[in-house]
Amino acid sequence: MAEQQGPEPAHERAAAGAVGASPAGMPGAVGVDAGGADQATEGAGRPEPGARVAPAFDDRHPPEQELLDDCVHCGFCLPTCPTYLLWGEEMDSPRGRIYLMGLGLEGEPMNDEMVRHFDQCLGCMACVTACPSGVQYDKLIEATRQQVERRWPRSRRDRAFRGLVFALFPYPGRLRWLRGPVRLYQRSGAGRLLRGARLLPRRLRTMERLLPDLPPAAPVAELTPAAGARRARVGMLTGCVQRVFFPQVNAATARVLAAEGCEVAAPRRQGCCGALSLHAGREAEAAGFARRLIAAFDDAAVDAVVVNAAGCGSAMKGYGHLLRDDPAWAARAAAFAAKVRDLSELLSELGPVAERHPLPLAVAYHDACHLGHAQQITAQPREQLGAIPGVELREIEEAEICCGSAGIYNLVEPEPAQELGDRKAAKLLATGADLLATANPGCLLQLRASLARRGARLPMAHVAEVLDASIRGLAVDALGVERPGAVAPRR
């Protein structure tokens, strides 16, 4: 498809507002003094008098011009982009952001507006699925975010909140320490008082509302033997949020794998995979987590590493790219990444041996973006759920649109995340399903909060929990479903 001709394209007209008329007067630009040292201004400040303005990107992994050139500005991405759907702004579309990246490579300085458009991208990769030209927007936005995080002077409040998030969520030990206080807080009713009095800042209010009711801890054994003949020896990522907020999902995952003939190794030394850090542009931090996780599985001697969290699986499959410049780790990272499998992906490769008992349920399956778009895994979860006797799968309208979770997006950009969550909740309820199934803890947290805002109740479960209930012959109430068919029928 030929590039647009004639009048100035919409994305170029809109870019004028994002880059301003004069680089020297750019609000919020990063200045460089005569000696070449970075002079980061605070928020919307201007460079020091006499300073020259630095280009938006430096030489450390900027977005690649070759990848930018793949975009022909055709607009096929627009109907699938969540932020474009919300606001209809060209610069809040993949095409517009790619144009801004190109301006940055040409030497335009980074500024408040440019950073805002990059920050508002969810990184959902729906555009990657939709693009007929094969534009690797995932690599482009990842490289851009790394530049923003290293070079852009965020406000003190923003830095403090992001610092809190990344001092907590990637560390399962710290999250475990909070389990007791959080459970006490939830049982005491203090949350209702705080929410009613609106004492918490906006972002902390969002974090508090996303917290699930914490179940009892259910640590996975370091080695779970296969039931019957061993078909494979697999490693299992226990994760951070999954391990602490959804321990029952990890327990179900290990049981399902064992029932299907897998010996499951879950090394105790494993920690965060680095997904949250990577998706937020914290490249060095993500690389450190990746090295430690690879090392934790070194002695496990596994055929595959199974992941039950979409964002984690997406990041781990990209370890070869993340550590490509590290001669000591590049080959190890690529070999490790080649072994990573989503749970449904591995089960489809193996084929079932465990008997499935009936579950008379209408199940709506929600595609997590980092599974459906980033890993292109859409058929396998449906195949696994559809093989359960009694299960009727119901598709969700706008399945390709993100629910608004997107790593830490719903914490740092709560307003658009809430709009997207409300939109997804309406589509979910319209299916009339008895149960929502998905494959990502962030989606479960986001959708539970979105339904709660509507005063609606729809039981939710991870795909692993649904499979586990069927294999063990449990009743539907084990999944929180009291009366199948109680939700309004599909319209």
Model-derived regions: residue spans:
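Non-heme iron-sulfur electron-transfer modules
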Residues: 2-3, 42-57, 84-116, 134-163, ...
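Intrinsically disordered, low-complexity terminal tails and inter-domain linkers enriched
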Residues: 4-52, 484
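Short, intrinsically disordered, charge-biased short linear motifs at domain edges
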Residues: 56-68, 107-110, 114-118, 225, ...
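Cysteine-centered iron-sulfur cluster-binding motifs in ferredoxin-type domains/subunits
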Residues: 65-84, 115-135, 370, 400
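Residue-level recognition of specific faces of alpha-helices
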Residues: 70, 97, 117-120, 233, ...
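N-terminal glycine-rich anion-binding loops that anchor highly charged ligand groups
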Residues: 75-79, 89-94, 262-266
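Short His/Asp/Glu-rich catalytic/ion-coordination signatures at enzyme active sites or charged loops
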Residues: 106, 126, 130, 281
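Iron-sulfur cluster-binding electron-transfer modules in prokaryotic oxidoreductases
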Residues: 137-491
